[in-house]
Regions:
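Jelly-roll (double-stranded beta-helix
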Residues: 1-323
């Protein structure tokens, strides 16, 4: 999914500050972001924000739906570019058709992951299929480390098997959890998994204590380490925990995502659909997209590519790190 804001702000994401991580659970609330047009979808964005810009290398999290396609028109994101990141698409309902400039043509369905590596430059389109009535899912981005940010663009698709737990199940789409490991490739250690909890269940997950973690709740009355996390909120825990204890106090099943990774040691600039290290790198990527260079062509999409928004009048520069 593209960041289709017409005036996207730059976000400078800083390396972790020295010192002992704060204990407890930090709750990050989402902001509503319309994706353009009077009938367009509105997403709930929890990353990046001023309170926290990264969880591991996870740098972007949009949560959308359940969205009635008959009212909103569904998803129709024209070809657009990416550099310096990987996109991760995960659905709860509906189907999205993916096309990209390396020739990939794939469908993503509930319980399946599409991972696209932008690297030096890729373009793609995303369109909900005609048979989709309800569209519901998440779009996530992962920042690539400096030594891999110019890697060749690529695409992977994987269908993780459900792993039963006492009180629920997980599907691991990136990294390792509950004895299962995803084969999907990443350039930094990461965790990405969907978990469902039975009504009234408490589940304790063994996790890497070197990771910071985020729990994004989709549905249910969820508590993480005793702290209430409402739907659409993202709960953060600092490194140092070897377990995450999740409870569903609702009379219906709960669904959530568990994200994680070691603190990302680099500063990055995010603007529009680009992740870079400097103002000049972002400017060059925008110019290349406008000229039709570098990003290839998406075949099979009926429509024009997305135009790049105007850059701000001042150079993209660091923002003060809140934490």
């Amino acid at each position: 999914m593209s960041n289709t804001e017409t005036r996207p702000a730059e976000v400078r994401c800083g390396a972790p500050e020295n010192g002992t991580p704060a204990a407890g659970v930090e709750i990050l609330t989402a902001r509503d972001v319309p994706l353009g047009g009077p009938r367009a979808m509105t997403v709930r964005r929890t990353l990046p924000q001023r309170a926290r810009t990264l969880i591991g290398a996870w740098c972007f999290a949009d949560h959308y739906g359940p969205d009635e396609v008959s009212r909103s028109g569904g998803m129709n994101v024209a070809p657009h570019p990416h550099i310096g990141l990987q996109t991760v698409s995960w659905l709860f309902s509906g189907t999205i058709e993916h096309r990209d400039s390396v020739g990939s043509h794939a469908l993503v369905r509930p319980g399946e992951v599409n991972l696209m590596s932008g690297g030096h430059g890729i373009s793609h389109s995303e369109v909900s299929t005609p048979d989709t009535t309800i569209l519901h899912g998440v779009q996530l981005w992962v920042a690539l480390p400096s030594e891999h940010r110019d890697t060749a663009p690529a695409f992977e698709h994987h269908v993780p098997a459900p792993v039963p737990l006492d009180g629920g199940e997980v599907r691991v789409f990136l990294g390792s959890l509950a004895g299962d490991t995803s084969p999907v490739g990443t350039f930094t250690p990461l965790l990405g998994a969907e978990a469902t909890l039975a009504p009234g269940a408490t589940v304790t997950l063994d996790v890497d204590p070197g990771f910071e973690h985020g729990v994004l709740v989709d549905s249910g009355d969820v508590r993480l380490e005793g702290t209430a996390v409402r739907p659409a909120e993202l709960a953060y825990t600092a490194p140092g925990r070897g377990t995450l204890t999740l409870t569903n106090e609702a009379p219906a099943p709960a669904r959530l995502l568990v994200l994680g990774g070691p603190p990302f040691p680099e500063e990055i600039i995010m603007w529009w659909n680009f992740v870079g290290r400097s103002h000049e790198e972002i400017v060059r990527a925008r110019e290349d997209w406008t000229k039709g260079d570098r990003f290839g062509e998406v075949h099979g999409y009926d429509g024009a590519p997305l135009p790049a928004p105007e850059l701000p009048n001042t150079p993209l520069k660091p923002r003060r790190r809140a934490r």
